[in-house]
């Protein structure tokens, strides 16, 4: 059943947004009156959460501006859930869409996957470019709301290959351990993944990969495995075992509002403004930054517009959001001296999705939380790390689904089209081809080692075998050491910082949010030590 706010709840949403905007204005003035630099954090994903916690723990007051909803405060629907199951989408599922737009577009070539929904400020957003769709999380917590929770630390030698400008020993001794601890990362237990019916699909795909000589691994996750045990035995409300993944997760997943953001909010020094988009950023003659803000309600009705001035601005809107704002400012002259490298070195983390007909039972019960992967990773361009993704259709489809991360050497570039007032992305199937080739070689070997198996060509758009047109892992555009200095401050623009996936040049070999978190931890330590917010 679709959630439809009545007049009273709609008024509450509008009033809440207006109150949040007023609170931001008041807090900014107070911070300035007290002699503190006025600090804005645009976005509330991994980098923004780390920045907020680091600053507030040092006594700074910050304004955090988030374009989506505060789902922690959202009322539950009539079924007791605030978030949707993948098989039962509502207007809470997607960001202002008339219809869901999931990575799988059909089953057997038939339009059984996506459903019509109401338009509202739902959890999963889609940024569309000519040849690429980027999935993003919308709401307080950013991508942590909509991802599968796979929390993977990259192989150190590959990290050094991708980011030689950073001290790998420092990252692996200090910042990756800190990031994993603060995110609540844990390895999946054998009693769940190794034996339960919910992971039969993973065990089968791992066994078939082993016949081809490929290793499997249990992949750490931010899901509460003890909670999943209770779900399994019917002692807790099903969430990860109830089909909740990309449209949000009610109970088991340790999203940022339950971890790093919770710590920041507990200081009382974060002034959170939700349902508010930063539409432009301008650097004024005195070096301060003027932000144009637009606030809407859950249905998209305009609540108000405002202008706020800050001494320091932290861009944490994700690769797409951060690049869009900065490229617009560069093209219009709103911020002078932005580096020419802005928008470059972008990539989809080599994401390629593929499905196999596995010719054996995968199970009608499938956990929505991925916990295993198979790999041949050796840092070459043939490398593949393939997440064993669930297919929670409620029946045994005998399909193995994989989200492959490849070591594609190609990069894309964001540019600003002044005539259309929009950002464009230079990426196409030719640039994606090395990733497709690596994934094909990998999966060909698995099929050859398992007679009777084959590719499934009925799940993706245009009946593609290898889905190379979307990504969950947008990276790059404002790379550390190129567009920013080695601490994340934009070159030539003092007081402007980047603290999200834009810092990573296009790929990192694994699901990237642990790396984004670790780099943000490192950068904030250095920036605070250097007094850049004083």
Which residues does each predicted region cover?
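Conserved redox-cofactor binding core of oxidoreductases
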Residues: 129, 165-277, 461-471
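A conserved short coil-to-beta-strand element within the FAD-binding core of flavoproteins
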Residues: 274-287
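A glycine-rich dinucleotide-binding beta-alpha-beta segment and adjacent secondary-structure elements
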Residues: 440-507, 513, 517
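FAD cofactor-binding and catalytic pocket of flavoenzymes
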Residues: 111-136, 140-143, 147, 161, ...
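N-terminal glycine-rich phosphate/pyrophosphate-binding loop and immediately adjacent elements
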Residues: 34-161, 166-168, 321, 335-357
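Glycine-rich loop(s) and the adjacent beta-strand/alpha-helix scaffold that form part
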Residues: 57, 61, 66-85, 281, ...
């Amino acid at each position: 059943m679709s959630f439809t706010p009545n007049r009273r709840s709609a008024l509450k949403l509008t009033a809440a947004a207006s109150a949040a905007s007023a609170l931001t204005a008041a807090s900014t003035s107070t911070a300035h009156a007290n002699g503190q630099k006025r600090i804005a954090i645009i976005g509330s994903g991994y980098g923004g959460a780390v920045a907020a916690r680091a600053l507030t723990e040092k006594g700074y007051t910050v304004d955090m501006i988030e374009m989506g909803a505060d789902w922690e405060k959202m009322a539950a629907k009539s079924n007791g859930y605030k978030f949707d199951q993948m098989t039962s989408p509502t207007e809470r599922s997607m960001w202002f869409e008339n219809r869901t737009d999931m990575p799988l577009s059909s089953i057997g070539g038939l339009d059984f996957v996506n459903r019509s929904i109401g338009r509202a400020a739902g959890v999963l957003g889609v940024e569309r470019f000519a040849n690429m769709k980027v999935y993003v999380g919308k709401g307080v917590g950013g991508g942590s709301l909509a991802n599968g929770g796979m929390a993977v630390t990259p192989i150190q030698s590959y990290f050094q290959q991708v980011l030689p400008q950073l001290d790998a020993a420092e990252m692996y001794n200090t910042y990756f351990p800190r990031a994993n601890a603060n995110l609540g990362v844990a390895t999946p237990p054998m009693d769940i993944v190794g034996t339960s019916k919910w992971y039969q699909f993973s065990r089968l795909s791992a066994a078939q990969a082993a016949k081809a000589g490929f290793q499997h691994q249990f992949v750490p996750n931010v899901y509460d495995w003890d909670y999943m045990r209770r779900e399994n035995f019917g002692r807790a409300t099903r969430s990860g075992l109830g089909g909740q993944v990309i449209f949000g997760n009610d109970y088991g997943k340790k999203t940022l509002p339950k971890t790093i953001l919770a710590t920041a909010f507990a200081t009382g020094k974060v002034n959170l403004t939700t349902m508010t988009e930063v539409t432009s950023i301008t650097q004024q003659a005195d070096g301060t930054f003027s932000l144009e803000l637009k606030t809407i309600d859950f249905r998209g009705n305009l609540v108000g517009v405002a202008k706020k001035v800050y001494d320091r601005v932290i861009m944490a809107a994700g690769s797409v959001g951060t690049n869009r704002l900065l490229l617009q400012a560069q093209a219009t002259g709103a911020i002078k001296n932005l580096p020419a490298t802005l928008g470059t070195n972008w990539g989809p983390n080599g994401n390629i999705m593929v499905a196999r007909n596995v010719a054996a039972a995968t199970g009608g019960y499938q956990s929505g939380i991925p916990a295993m992967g198979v790999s041949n990773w050796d840092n070459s361009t043939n490398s593949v790390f393939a997440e064993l993704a669930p297919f929670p259709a409620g029946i045994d489809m005998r399909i193995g689904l994989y989200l492959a991360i490849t070591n594609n050497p190609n990069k894309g570039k964001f540019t600003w089209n002044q005539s259309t007032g929009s950002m464009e992305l230079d990426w196409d199937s030719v640039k994606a081809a090395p990733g497709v080739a690596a994934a094909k070689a990998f999966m060909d070997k698995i099929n050859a080692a398992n007679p009777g198996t084959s590719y499934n060509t009925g799940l993706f758009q245009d009946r593609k075998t290898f889905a190379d047109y979307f990504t969950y892992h947008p990276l790059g555009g404002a790379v550390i050491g190129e567009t920013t200095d080695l601490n994340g401050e934009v070159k030539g623009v003092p007081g402007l910082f980047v603290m999200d996936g834009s810092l990573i040049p296009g790929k990192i070999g694994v699901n990237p949010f642990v790396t984004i978190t670790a780099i943000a931890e490192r950068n904030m330590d250095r920036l605070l030590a250097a007094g850049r917010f004083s």
